[in-house]
């Protein structure tokens, strides 16, 4: 939790229209609070697998509201607490998948654009879309639009620097059986 909150001092996108950038602000905090300790050698892949499962499981993959759009989530988040946490997991897996796609294509990682901006000089949706279009083309923009619309994001096998193996996991929430995902260290 402390690492998550510390990350909020760095990547920031204007979310004054709640829902437009919650995925980015919370997704970055979740992604980097997982990856930075791992990359620095402060945490093991086994420990971070537990963290990823907690962050992506209950907040996103096991959440009955997971397929609401970002803007729909913003509208319901104060009536249904589950709506508040979807952008954390959705943003995290979107960023992890996007980073994997960029690396496979031999392009700059998400670290490149995210570290180019900070609290004082905030990234905008336009900056993000330009970066995605320039490096991943219209296919990257399509996936970005799908993320915003609430389409379920399937984990990329190379997400999180390729250090984890993802597998399907069935869960039941509110009487509904859903396909979820979990990971384990490779």
Residue spans of the language-model regions?
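Secretory-pathway/luminal and periplasmic proteins that interact with or process carbohydrate-rich
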Residues: 38-42, 60-62, 119-126, 154
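Short glycine/serine- and small hydrophobic-enriched flexible loop segments
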Residues: 31-38, 93-104
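Long, well-structured alpha-helical subdomains associated
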Residues: 43-93, 128
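Zinc-dependent metallopeptidase catalytic helix centered on the HExxH motif
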Residues: 1-61
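Beta/coil-rich, acidic/histidine-enriched accessory regions frequently appended to metallopeptidases
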Residues: 120-186
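Soluble non-cytosolic domains of exported or imported proteins
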Residues: 1, 19-23, 85-93, 104, ...
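Structural helix-adjacent loops and short alpha-helical linkers that scaffold large soluble proteins
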Residues: 37-49, 102-110, 135-143
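Acidic helix/loop microenvironments that form the catalytic cleft of cell-wall polysaccharide enzymes
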Residues: 26, 30-33, 109-122
């Amino acid at each position: 939790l402390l690492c998550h909150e510390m990350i909020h001092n760095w990547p920031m996108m204007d979310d004054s229209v709640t829902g437009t950038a919650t995925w980015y602000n919370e997704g970055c905090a979740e992604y980097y609070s997982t990856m930075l300790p791992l990359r620095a050698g402060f945490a093991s892949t086994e420990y971070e697998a537990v963290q990823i499962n907690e962050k992506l499981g209950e907040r996103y993959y096991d959440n009955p509201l997971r397929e609401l759009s970002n803007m729909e989530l913003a509208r319901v988040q104060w009536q249904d607490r589950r709506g508040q946490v979807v952008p954390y997991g959705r943003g995290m897996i979107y960023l992890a998948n996007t980073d994997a796609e960029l690396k496979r294509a031999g392009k700059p990682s998400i670290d490149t654009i995210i570290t180019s901006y900070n609290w004082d000089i905030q990234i905008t949706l336009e900056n993000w879309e330009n970066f995605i279009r320039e490096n991943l083309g219209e296919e990257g923009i399509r996936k970005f639009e799908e993320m915003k619309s609430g389409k379920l994001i399937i984990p990329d096998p190379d997400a999180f620097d390729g250090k984890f193996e993802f597998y399907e996991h069935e869960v039941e929430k509110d009487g509904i059986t859903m396909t979820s995902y979990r990971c384990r260290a490779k």
